[in-house]
From Swiss-Prot:
Regulation: Kept in an inactive conformation by FKBP1A preventing receptor activation in absence of ligand. CD109 is another inhibitor of the receptor.
Signal peptide: 1-29
An example Gene Ontology CC term for this record: bicellular tight junction
InterPro entries cross-referenced by the UniProt entry: Activin_recp, GS_dom, Kinase-like_dom_sf, Prot_kinase_dom, Protein_kinase_ATP_BS, Ser/Thr_kinase_AS, Snake_toxin-like_sf, TGFB_receptor
Cofactor(s) required, per the database record: Mg(2+); Mn(2+)
Chain's gene name: TGFBR1
Position of sequence motif FKBP1A-binding: 193-194
Cellular compartment(s): Cell membrane; Cell junction, Tight junction; Membrane raft; Cell surface
Disulphide bonds in the chain: 32-50, 34-37, 44-67, 82-96, 97-102
Source organism per UniProt: Sus scrofa (Pig)
Chain ranges on the Extracellular side, renumbered to this chain: 30-126
This protein's UniProt keywords: Apoptosis, ATP-binding, Cell junction, Cell membrane, Differentiation, Disulfide bond, Glycoprotein, Growth regulation, Isopeptide bond, Kinase, Magnesium, Manganese, Membrane, Metal-binding, Nucleotide-binding, Phosphoprotein, Receptor, Serine/threonine-protein kinase, Signal, Tight junction, Transferase, Transmembrane, Transmembrane helix, Ubl conjugation
Protein name: TGF-beta receptor type-1
Cross-link (Glycyl lysine isopeptide (Lys-Gly) (interchain with G-Cter in SUMO)): 391
Amino acid sequence: MEVAAGAPRSRLLLFVLAATATLAPEATAFQCFCHLCTKDNFTCVTDGLCFVSVTETTDKVIHNSMCIAEIDLIPRDRPFVCAPSSKTGSVTTTYCCNQDHCNKIELPTVGPFPGKPPSGLGPVELAAVIAGPVCFVCISLMLMVYICHNRTVIHHRVPNEEDPSLDRPFISEGTTLKDLIYDMTTSGSGSGLPLLVQRTIARTIVLQESIGKGRFGEVWRGKWRGEEVAVKIFSSREERSWFREAEIYQTVMLRHENILGFIAADNKDNGTWTQLWLVSDYHEHGSLFDYLNRYTVTVEGMIKLALSTASGLAHLHMEIVGTQGKPAIAHRDLKSKNILVKKNGTCCIADLGLAVRHDSATDTIDIAPNHRVGTKRYMAPEVLDDSINMKHFESFKRADIYAMGLVFWEIARRCSIGGIHEDYQLPYYDLVPSDPSVEEMRKVVCEQKLRPNIPNRWQSCEALRVMAKIMRECWYANGAARLTALRIKKTLSQLSQQEGIKM
């Protein structure tokens, strides 16, 4: 394109004008194409610029070609008339030039025009296009909420052919859990069912209902081949607790009538989250805490609850030497909520996630670095004031004894003699808040040296008097002076014989 030779412009201005296609007119006149000039052979003469435009509206396209006089070029270096424009309902594209018939060109259109619906879509189709994505988003959100709400209810499916390691022939039809446990204890290593059998059992359990929640996750009642089981489902962040508890439960020779019967452990990754399952025997009475809240007990019932708890703890604490031996184990979180009541009125100790084992050969204790664990209300004085000897395994056993003395106090309060009994309460209910801190417990137990109150009426009943004596000997500030679990078991066994109680 040419630019007016006589225009007093710098080289920079020439470059800008050329780049923007906004041109000053030639000094002499020239001819342009004019679509309205029918008498002059569609030609006009101007001393300004040739002009061409195309205007698009919602329903038509208008082409326009003509001459623009120099006097109409305002401002002269960037005329408004040569600038493209856009307003509601139309878009105009323009082009100005300064050579003969330079505007005789076809400008491109921008179509389809903005705001105009595609010619192929009617009102119904347009509504479908708009409503479709909206419905999809709504359904997706509802599905996500449903999955999140019911994720723990997802049933384990029967193993399929894509997972041959879980094929059903490993457990024949008609086999019961009792059969499997019997075979394991009589012919196996005594350390639990084979992992393949555990996984097969876990993945064929149908969950029925949630029966409890805790800091680890949730407990469900489930069914395996018609038999009721308890399923403890750990949250994924509690994987260490799940692994530790499964490991402790599978300790050689641990199985005992007063230790919760372990059945299986399994982890299942469904692609979105990991479920960590611990399957055990189901006891419909629930925890000792729940049981004592609901019922009072007779003297016989009190002795059965206490003796079975002591028997379970004595078995945990005891080391069995031999080829199929068992290491000594300390519970470290003994309380009424971690003891279950069986159908026959006896107890079994559960929740071994914080337990520690002692290797007598090397005199080592497998314990996490943080020793301040368990429930603050049941912590022994030496745990509260940090004076416990972490390198001495007996220290952990003695702390368990202190906690068991508090559990006995909870049981004895609910023993009804002549229709008289105390309401259920947690230990130190009258001395500390419902969720006491370590400092609050330390002040009461270590500084003030207070212990739960023993009612005077207990002295009028031999069984309650013996229970009170055992409690006091479990609560000594000096752990070495406390009774052992085996000594307590023997004392309660003698009491049960005196009372004519059959366990």
